[in-house]
Each structure stands twice: as C-alpha cells, then as structure tokens.
C-alpha cells in the first residue's frame, strides 16, 4: 500500500504536468497563454509519513488513504490564473468608392481588437512544509516519529531521485575547558544535545514535533534558561541579537545563513548555535553538528549574533 500510494500521488503529479504543458491547447478562448510553473516533485518518505500520521499509526489501504492524498495534493499544488486584455491592431482592407475618381479603390484600415493573455502560475508549496499548517500537535508528533525512522522502511524508494535517505547525525565533542569556562554555554549545550538525531521538521518547535532550524534555536535558548526567545523564525532571532564580527564569535553565539532555501527566498533562511572551533549545532537533517568551514556553509554565511543573556 505504501508503494501504491506513492504511485497514485505520482500519477496525479504527471496529470498536473500534462495539464500545464497543454494549457494553451485546452484553453483556445485565450489568444496567448504564459505558464510559470514550479518543479513538480515530492519526497516519497514525506508522503508516507503524512499518511501514516493521519491514520495515527493504524493500518491503512490505498482506498482509505485516497482522501489524504487528495487533500495534500490540493495543499501542495496551487494553480492560479489571471487574464489581461491588451488593445492591439490588425490591418484590414476594403473596397470603397472614391467620388473624385469615380472608381472603387482599396483602402487599408487599422482596426483595434482585444487580445487576451492568460497568465498561469503553478506553485509547489513543498509537501514537507504542509504538516505544520494542517495537522494537530499530536499528529505532528506522529509525523516527526515517522520522519525519524522512515517507518522502518528505509530503502523502499531506492532509485527515486526525490527520496531523501536517512542520515546519521554528525557528532562532535566540545572540549571540557570550553564548557567549564561558561556555565551559560554549558547549559545551552546540555539542552541542545538532548535532541541530536531528531529529524528536521518544517515548523517544528518542540521535542514532540521535532524542530526546524529556528524552532530548535528558540527552544534551546528558552528551555536552557539562558534567554526566553519565544517561538521565532530565523529573521526574528536575528533581530534579538547584537551583531558580532566573525573574528569575535564565541561559543553560544547564533550563526545565521542566507540563500539555503533556493532562489526566490531572500534574507536569512537558516540558523544554528556556534560551539567554537568552527563548529555549530543545528537542526539539519537530522539535528547534529556541522563544520562552518565546509564550502556549503561558507558560501551561505550571513552573520553571527549574540543573544541577550550571553
């Protein structure tokens, strides 16, 4: 049933792609059709986790899962249409009698007409971004559990280019002297390291739902007792911090990145907690450590910031 559900969802996507390709042919009422479409794709492990969470871990079949597939397909793919009308001119000729020459003559006319252009926008809202806006807290927790284990079916979608496999978290031992030098930083790390290995869940902000990047940083600062940030996004966390030059960054500072979500998303898009020696702990995929000297993080680095309380 898992593979059948994936096949059914992929079939819906193929139909949508065909609809976009043939939009002009299927809408002859427009003089011109312009289509701006996001890539049509989904991670099949995310789909499996959504279905399983919606059934609260109980058995399901393709037939019983179809309403869930339909619901999330409509949430994921949004098609909007707008029509503009332009005033254009065409050239026509007609025969007219010229009384001066007493002859019929061909006259060229510039005739106005309405030219309709249909602008079609297909937005892919990313299937993994939908649980937070469509599930209860309990169901989100179930979703996070399935994302952490892939339902113990890792490899079932082998060969699917959009299937993101489970990864082991990167581990790192913070030097004892670094922890001993700052009880505040030690409190942060005592809280942060509880969640190593938890999956990245868009919109997640608690151990029950797991975390996204800003949810993780917010939760760790708040529940370590260092500083109550509330639940903020990455940009909101940056606004709380005072700027710190990279050369003066200290363990416990927050490190911010930009451009990690691809084109079209401006500003700060990711954050983590700096732990010294060029390392950070963050909600990646999964929560773990990362080396800031890696080419990827260097290319997306935005700034360091220091929270109140540090």
Which role does the model predict for each range below?
Residues 2-199, 299-310:
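Intrinsically disordered, low-complexity
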Residues 234-235, 239-247, 261-310:
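Aromatic- and glycine-rich peptidoglycan recognition patches
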Residues 178-185, 209-214, 248, 265:
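Solvent-exposed, acidic/flexible segments
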Residues 198-251:
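Catalytic cysteine-centered active-site loop
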């Amino acid at each position: 049933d898992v593979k059948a559900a994936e096949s059914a969802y992929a079939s819906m996507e193929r139909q949508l792609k065909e609809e976009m390709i043939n939009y002009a042919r299927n809408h002859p009422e427009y003089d011109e059709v312009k289509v701006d479409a996001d890539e049509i794709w989904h991670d099949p492990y995310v789909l499996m986790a959504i279905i399983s969470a919606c059934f609260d871990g109980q058995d399901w079949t393709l037939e019983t899962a179809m309403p869930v597939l339909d619901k999330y397909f409509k949430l994921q793919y949004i098609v909007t249409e707008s029509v503009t009308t332009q005033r254009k001119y065409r050239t026509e000729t007609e025969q007219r009698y010229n009384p001066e020459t007493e002859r019929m003559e061909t006259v060229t006319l510039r005739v106005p007409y309405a030219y309709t252009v249909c602008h079609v926008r297909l937005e892919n809202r990313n299937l993994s971004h939908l649980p937070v806006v469509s599930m209860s807290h309990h169901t989100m927790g179930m979703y996070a559990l399935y994302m952490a284990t892939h339902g113990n079916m890792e490899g079932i979608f082998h060969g699917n280019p959009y299937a993101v496999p489970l990864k082991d978290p990167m581990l790192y031992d913070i030097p004892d002297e670094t922890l001993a030098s700052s009880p505040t930083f030690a409190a942060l790390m005592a809280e942060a390291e509880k969640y190593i290995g938890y999956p990245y869940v868009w919109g997640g902000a608690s151990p029950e739902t797991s975390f996204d990047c800003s949810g993780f940083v917010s939760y760790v600062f708040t529940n370590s007792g260092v500083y109550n940030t509330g639940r903020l996004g990455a940009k909101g966390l940056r606004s709380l911090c005072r700027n710190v030059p990279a050369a003066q960054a200290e363990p416990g500072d927050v490190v911010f990145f930009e451009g990690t979500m691809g084109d079209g998303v401006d500003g700060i898009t990711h954050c983590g907690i700096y732990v010294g020696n060029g390392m950070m702990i963050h909600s990646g995929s999964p929560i773990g450590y990362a080396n800031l000297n890696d080419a990827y993080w260097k290319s997306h680095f935005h700034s360091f910031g220091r929270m109140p309380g540090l």
